A protein has these predicted regions:
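Cytosolic, membrane-interface loops and tails of multi-pass inner-membrane proteins
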Residues: 4-21, 83-104, 200-228, 279-283
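Multi-pass membrane catalytic core of lipid/isoprenoid biosynthesis enzymes
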Residues: 85, 93-134, 223-247
């Protein structure tokens, strides 16, 4: 027979376990890692825009901007999962997502998503400026309303989805500056171009899953890998001049240009290595090349943005 203390300990342990599971479900619903990436890119845009104005970026405007962006991104993720719950349930990689597995109800997810997108956008419009709130709402609508349904119709969804996917650093810039300017567009271009090798690697790794769910990713429609590799290489090469655009505009200096060139050549090297999938017959090795490119992409972008911030306006410090 268990003592009261032991029973209490077991009850507390079960409650703690349920709480962890609950937290993990909502972290997955709101795509916490994607939301963090959006916040990081938005922070870079705000930081560079603030220094362009000659003011410190470390103010309430930064917190308001990042908080609003995080809320809208989380809401968009919830709406995306609501729309894709059936296809998610058909893929091994996503079958355990909370809405696909039925742990979070459809209505609950939709209400959370719509509320977060609406109130987050309104918050940004009020606390920063109307342009920033509008761009953030456009990002959410583009991602949920256009990109998500197009994934089942055409491989062009990846290209179209790259537009809302690249807006966060521009949103950070407009929050600091109140207008769309060429440096903000350059930040948009960096994120736009970066996405293609990144997503092609993901699509190649999980092409069987996408095929079973009826999602028209490039590796599904062109299974020989030629188009996947060609697109990846094209954008990886393009990444080199695009990453230097901020220096041409006077936002960053020569030290950044050196760092950006080295980083971009490294990104290109992993993309060239990814091209081995064209001749690789071992599916495990083919997947490994894609996984290595994916890892390189998620290391490359934060390092590139950090280099921008360290060398902003020609400085070599924050």
């Amino acid at each position: 027979m268990q003592s009261p203390a032991t029973t209490q300990d077991l009850t507390g342990s079960a409650a703690a376990s349920r709480f962890r599971e609950w937290m993990m479900d909502y972290a997955e619903l709101f795509k916490a890692r994607v939301t963090l990436l959006v916040v990081i890119t938005g922070a870079a845009g705000f930081y560079l825009g603030s220094l362009r104005s000659g003011i410190s970026p470390f103010n309430m405007g930064l917190l308001n901007t990042l908080g609003g962006m995080a809320v809208v991104t989380a809401g968009s993720a919830a709406l995306n999962e609501a729309l894709e719950r059936r296809s998610d349930a058909q893929m091994r990689r996503t079958a355990r997502r909370p809405m696909a597995a039925g742990r979070i109800g459809l209505l609950h997810g939709l209400l959370l998503g719509f509320a977060a997108v609406f109130f987050g956008s309104m918050f940004l419009a009020h606390e920063t400026n109307l342009l920033t709130g509008t761009l953030t709402l456009i990002t959410a609508v583009g991602y949920v309303g256009i990109y998500t349904p197009l994934k089942r119709m055409t491989t062009l969804a990846t290209f179209i989805g790259a537009f809302p996917g690249a807006l966060p650093p521009l949103i950070g810039w407009t929050a600091a500056r109140g207008m769309i300017e060429w440096p903000g567009v350059a930040l948009f271009a960096v994120l736009f171009v970066w996405q293609f090798p990144h997503f092609m690697a993901i699509a190649w790794m999980y092409r069987e899953d996408y095929a079973s769910a009826g999602i028209k990713m490039t590796p599904v429609v062109s299974p020989n890998g030629l188009t996947t590799v060609a697109q990846s290489l094209f954008y990886a090469v393009l990444m080199i001049p695009v990453s230097l655009w901020t220096t041409w505009l006077g936002v960053t200096g020569i030290p950044y240009s050196i760092a950006a060139t080295i980083l971009s050549l490294g990104y290109l090297w992993y993309t060239v290595r990814f091209a081995r999938i064209l001749k690789e017959t071992d599916p495990l090795k083919s997947r490994a090349y894609a996984r290595d490119l994916l890892k390189a992409s998620v290391i490359y972008l934060p390092l590139l943005l950090a280099a921008m911030m360290l060398n902003a306006q020609g400085r070599i410090f924050f």
